[in-house]
Amino acid sequence: MELKSIKKLSLTVNTVILIMVFGLMFFFHLCNVTFLVYFSIPTSMIYVIGYCLIHKNKLNIYVWLVFSWLTFYMGVTTICLGYDYGFHLYCFSMIPTMFVTEYMSYKLNKRSLWAFNVSILIAFFYLICTGYVASFGPVYEVNSKTASAFFWIFNAMTVFGFLIFYSKYLIYSIIKSEEKLSEIAH
């Protein structure tokens, strides 16, 4: 696993997330959820900063920034809009992604990301956000079955797609490492 390939993957993921933030910002505008429109502005800046961190090889800082803000952003959107839009699903994807990233960090001889402890915090945060919605309902009532169905499917497909491709990348990297070790041993 080389730094170059991890940087390329990070740039791709960062670009996809940034595009999604702008798409969500437009959706929030259409639904008159003004708070989330404005909340998307600092969110987009986080991912612009991400490009600088990737460029400067500050991948540990980048990972912490993205994971913490993405988890926070999806928690806020869940509280604002409720379960029907599927934003809470992203918290689930953060947990296995944390462990995959822990492995990548190990392969690059970087510091531990404390995947286990962070995963517990993510689960706790998820329970707080979804518990709030279960107890009090969402902050905004957006009465659009079409929008909620679209976003539930879109968010579920995004989460599953990300998990599948991220896991595939990890397994591919592990296999390549094993093959290199096998070549060296023989």
Predicted segments, located by residue:
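Hydrophobic, aromatic-rich alpha-helical transmembrane segments
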Residues: 7, 33-37, 145, 149, ...
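Membrane-interface elements of multi-pass transporters and channels
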Residues: 33, 56-57, 83-84, 132-140, ...
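Amphipathic, heptad-repeat alpha-helical coiled-coil "signal-transmission/dimerization" linkers
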Residues: 167, 171-174, 178, 182-185
